A protein has these predicted regions:
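Bacterial N-terminal signal peptides that target proteins for export
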Residues: 2-17
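A detector of low-complexity, intrinsically disordered, Ser/Thr/Gly/Pro/Ala-rich segments
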Residues: 7-10, 22, 124
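Hydrophobic helical h-region of N-terminal Sec-dependent signal peptides
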Residues: 15-21, 25
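Sec/Tat signal peptide C-region and signal peptidase I cleavage site
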Residues: 25-31
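Hydrophobic small-molecule pocket/channel-lining residues, especially in calycin-type beta-barrels
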Residues: 31-268
Length: 268
């Protein structure tokens, strides 16, 4: 699963890109769990577009909102502004139709750089994001957004109609019965905790400030909730296919269940 509440902000949203995958074992042994192993994101089978969000002009700049529990103010003056989960963003405008932003963690480490270009007719925005990972590598994402309403310029409601990402690897293990450990190698992030709904803090050098709580409704399924500072930012459900070869992670923002993102992973 991808913590889109943390991630979408930098492409709106790419800089908080934290991919977490949960697993469930219950009373079964780790060897019997269908979640244990190495998983690779199948970009072609995944559905990553469809989300809507807005930029609203304010007396001092703009306010971003995902229409759910994520909202923050910023200006295009190059200064750092707080967003969520301990992240900051700085924006600059270059001409009438081009914007650049830089997302950082609480220690000032650059997480993502985002370049946005608005079409001449003001109807389409192309967004290119470069994400900087903890292992020293980078990856690029390209999004196409269409204006739903509003304008001119950045202001208005937008919908993502195309999202192009690079694949990544997830490693899942079961250290003990009723516990899951997930590792994201390129982010050097670990999520380890119980499957009884108890919140577990995300660990890692550039991890966001937040917790994920898991529950197990079935042997091949779990539900999860990501929260930061007491506010639920994202929810989801992960399911392993009956043949054990595919993991499907469906996620959404609270109150926006009609805009679900679907990530499909192949077992390696």
């Amino acid at each position: 699963m991808k913590l889109r509440a943390v991630a979408r902000m930098s492409r709106t949203y790419a800089a908080f890109s934290l991919v977490l995958l949960a697993a469930t074992v219950g009373a079964a042994s780790a060897a019997e769990s269908p979640f244990v192993g190495t998983w690779q994101l199948n970009v072609e089978k995944s559905k990553l577009a469809g989300e809507t969000f807005s930029y609203t002009a304010t007396p001092t700049g703009f306010q971003y909102s995902n229409g759910s529990t994520v909202k923050f103010d910023f200006a295009t003056d190059g200064k750092d502004y707080p967003v969520i989960a301990g992240r900051t963003v700085s924006w600059t405008q270059n001409g009438n139709n081009t914007w650049d932003s830089v997302y950082k963690d609480g220690h000032g480490t650059v997480l993502s750089k985002v370049h946005r270009v608005l079409s001449a007719d003001g109807k389409t925005m192309t967004v290119i994001s470069t994400d900087y990972h903890a292992d020293g590598t980078t990856s690029q994402e390209t999004d196409i957004r269409e204006r739903v309403s509003g304008g001119p310029g950045l202001a208005g409601t937008w919908k993502e109609v195309k999202v192009k990402v690079t694949s990544h690897t997830l490693i899942i293990s079961m250290p003990s019965a009723g516990h899951v450990k997930y590792e994201n190698p390129r982010q050097k992030q670990i999520l380890e905790g119980p499957l009884d709904g108890t919140p577990s803090r995300v660990q890692g050098p550039i991890a966001p400030e937040g917790t994920v709580a898991f529950k197990q409704p079935g042997s091949n399924k779990l539900t999860w909730t990501f929260a930061s500072k007491g506010t639920v930012l994202q929810q989801g459900e992960d399911t392993v296919s009956s043949d054990g070869k595919t993991l499907t992670s469906v996620s959404w923002f609270p109150g926006k269940e009609s805009e679900k993102t679907i990530e499909v992973f192949d077992k390696q």
